[in-house]
From Swiss-Prot:
GO molecular function, one term: zinc ion binding
Protein name listed in UniProt: 7-cyano-7-deazaguanine synthase
Cofactors that this protein relies on: Zn(2+)
InterPro entries in alphabetical order: QueC (IPR018317), Rossmann-like_a/b/a_fold (IPR014729)
Catalytic class of the enzyme: ligase
Origin species: Methylorubrum extorquens (strain CM4 / NCIMB 13688)
EC nos: 6.3.4.20
Lineage: Bacteria, Pseudomonadati, Pseudomonadota, Alphaproteobacteria, Hyphomicrobiales
Length: 243
């Protein structure tokens, strides 16, 4: 990792949790619109939809092409291997099993501790890089009920990270109180229809990692919970645009 990037970012710089999905791509555009220096971080934890990691480079390149200022602000990309997370998780995201709901109402796509681990490692990297702001795509408005996506969870973790690292990190969750339709609209607000098309074409959301089927909202199996949320959100976004 080049150390000079940390100096360029300073405390005004940001680190974005960037999976290659719709939400993280929108969050990256949001961060590029606000911070003078932005770095990205992806995680390989043995997820079935590992194809999302392959989309990250194309999304980063596409975002820099949309706005010269974004290109100047976009810094290095980092990837961390968290194989242990996948090894201890018996979920439909890390095992070849059918997606279903458990008795507690949570889908078996929930990876316990995933966002807690992601944000903790992100803070450790931000500490080294000299970056104060950490941006994630967590949301509790239009989501699958994951407890580590809740606003209370993120606020509590921010306190713990700052106490444990003696820093003043700020955890930003720009999608926390908006639904998928509004997330599509936010992308248009940030980068126009060109950004919406970039997210449609290059981002990946499908839990099964399906890239063979192209829909108006992007690629995916079309039936898993992630595809369902994305498709319905895109439909509502288009309907609102037409009004």
């Amino acid at each position: 990792m080049p150390e000079d990037a940390a100096v360029a970012g300073g405390e005004a710089g940001a680190l974005v949790l960037f999976s290659g999905g719709q939400d993280s791509a929108t969050c990256l555009a949001w961060a590029l619109d606000r911070f003078p220096h932005v770095e990205t971080l992806g995680f390989d934890y043995g997820q079935r939809h590992w194809v999302e990691l392959d989309r990250r480079a194309a999304l980063r390149q596409g975002l820099t092409a949309l706005d010269p200022a974004w290109g100047r602000r976009l810094g290095p990309d980092h990837t961390l291997a968290l194989a242990a997370l996948g090894e201890i998780s018996d979920t439909a995201l890390t095992r070849d099993s059918a997606i279903a709901f458990a008795r507690d109402g949570l889908p078996n796509t929930f990876v316990p501790g995933r966002n807690l681990a992601f944000l903790t490692f992100a803070a450790a990297l931000a500490y080294r890089r000299g970056l104060r702001h950490i941006v994630g795509g967590m949301c509790e408005t239009d989501y699958s009920g994951y407890p580590d996506c809740r606003d209370d969870t993120i606020k509590a973790l921010q306190v713990a990270l700052n106490l444990g690292m003696e820093r003043r990190f700020v955890l930003h969750t720009p999608l926390m109180w908006i639904d998928k339709a509004q997330t599509w609209a936010l992308a248009e607000t940030l980068g126009g229809r060109a950004l919406v098309e970039l997210v449609v074409e290059e981002s990946h959301t499908c839990y099964l990692g399906e890239r063979g089927a192209r829909h108006e909202w992007g690629y995916g199996c079309g039936t898993c919970p992630a595809c369902d949320l994305r498709a319905k959100g895109f439909s509502r976004y288009l309907a609102a645009r037409a009004d």
